[in-house]
Amino acid sequence: MFVCALVLAVGLAAVMGILYSNFDGQMRKELSKEAAYLAYGVEQQGVDYLKNIKDKSARITYIDQDGTVLFDNEADVSEMKNHSDRTEFQKAEKYGAGESSRYSDTLSEKTIYYALRLKDGTVLRLSLIHISEPTRQEAIS
């Protein structure tokens, strides 16, 4: 009986791990696509393009080459620290794009970040709170 329960628990944990991994990958793909779309708008219209976006499903941060935050749709940029030390920013600077997951002091939540370097060297960063599938679907609706 104990062995059956143990096998069932291990099997359930494995399935949950696979589902979590797939959902996490989907969130990262979504951020990548959204960043490319927003980057085009910023390159055409500048930061004003971001200021006119009503959809708040992702946090948007626009960062200068030196790490100074130029725009954020959820926080006061005058109170934000320089972002040049952030992993996703450094990867975007070096490789053109970068991502990371960590605890956000601003949002007080575990967050997934995706950063994309634009043609002028600025960086557009999108982030999502790392939440479960049902909660994410409710947030989008």
What spans do the regions from the language model cover?
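Sensory beta-strand/linker motifs that couple input domains to effectors
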Residues: L126
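Single conserved hydrophobic/aromatic residue that forms the stacking wall/gate
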Residues: I129-S141
